[in-house]
Amino acid sequence: MADVRQPRAAGRSTINSLVLPNPIGRRAIVVGAGSFGTAIAVLLARGGLRTTLQTRTEEQAEQLRESHENARYLPGIKLPQELRIESVESGLSRGEIIFLGLPSRAITETVAELEARGLRRRVPIVAMSKGLVPPDGQLPSRVLAQRFGPLRVACIGGPAHAQEMVNDGAALVVASENENVANLIQQVFLRAGVVCEKTLDPVGVELGGVAKNAAALAAGATEAQGLNAAGAAAGHIFAEVWDYAARLGARPQSLLGLAGIGDLVATALAPHSRNRRAGELLAAGVPPAEIPARVGQAIEAMETVPLLARALSLAGVQAPVTSGLSQLIAGELPLDEWTQLVRTTVPSTSRWRGQTSRAVTARMRDAMRFKGTTSLPPESDS
């Protein structure tokens, strides 16, 4: 790993025209106090950054300051005394590394608001969501790169259930087109005691998270039909996103590693997976608009799958299962027809550097079968 630290007296280093702070003792801001944003803020504080967690309202900030706990999203985790908590109204002028713990749908609007409140363009900005940005289904890192330039943008993926990440660690992946930015973020997490891989493939890492959420939703929607159906649904979704990722120039390792299959298996095994639970509720006939309230948090996959289906179609990718899942969410396809589609679809034979979509489907079917169980386990908040 390249060492991006500079002597404290030097203060800052210039890398590829980007001014990067010495991470240790410098200021990081996490925007968004959901389960994952809160967990990341705790880890950053442990990793030596002077960290601020920003909530949507001052009332929320006051609650967290008084209780030293995010009881709604991360119960049982004591917030470090050194973690500063404030609302987004406080602005970002002090931030030297910015982490966005926001749903993908909120990124464009929120970044515009934050720019007006002092977000500087010459600091690294890290996307942490696992979805697509409306209306065109763009990846979060690409939306940010359009505003700030690709050398200042990074993203995070991998199996990272928030509660477990704080207590027992996780296996994160940080990706950026700028290797030195990836080094910087990796260093902070390693100092916090979290395994963190780095890559120059933000497209692959983000699509791995998108595929994982969509596949978990699909598995939940077919769970009542058996493990084979659930595994097939997840495998088909993953294979279709795989083909799309190939067209965007992503690396196979990104989807086959921690950010893709690793994240999906963690979600499938998790006792509280939001996206899989949403699929179960969808199959039970709960109206899609009511599902987030039933689960208690935003469901990234419910919003992302229609965008994903559209993006795959525009890219010319054959994606019958993703398209069918989008129709199921919209109430345009009955559940029995969705299940039949999953059972009868044969993956395309498109190839990607020696790998076939069918081989990916087989891997996913194996990964999603759970020995000695009769149904997929219950939800992850990553």
Task: Enumerate the predicted regions with their spans.
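Rossmann-like NAD(P)(H) cofactor-binding subdomain of soluble oxidoreductases
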Residues: L79, R84-G169, I185
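Alpha-helical phosphate/pyrophosphate-handling elements in metalloenzyme active cores
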Residues: G235-G249
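NAD(P)+-binding Rossmann beta1-loop-alpha1 motif at the extreme N-terminus of oxidoreductases
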Residues: R5-I77, E86-S87, T356
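NAD(P)-dependent Rossmann-like dehydrogenase/reductase catalytic/cofactor-binding core
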Residues: K212, A219-G220, A246-G260, L264-S382
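Electropositive phosphate-/nucleotide-binding environments in soluble metabolic enzymes
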Residues: G34, T38, E58, I85-E89, ...
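Rossmann-fold dinucleotide-binding core
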Residues: L132-L227
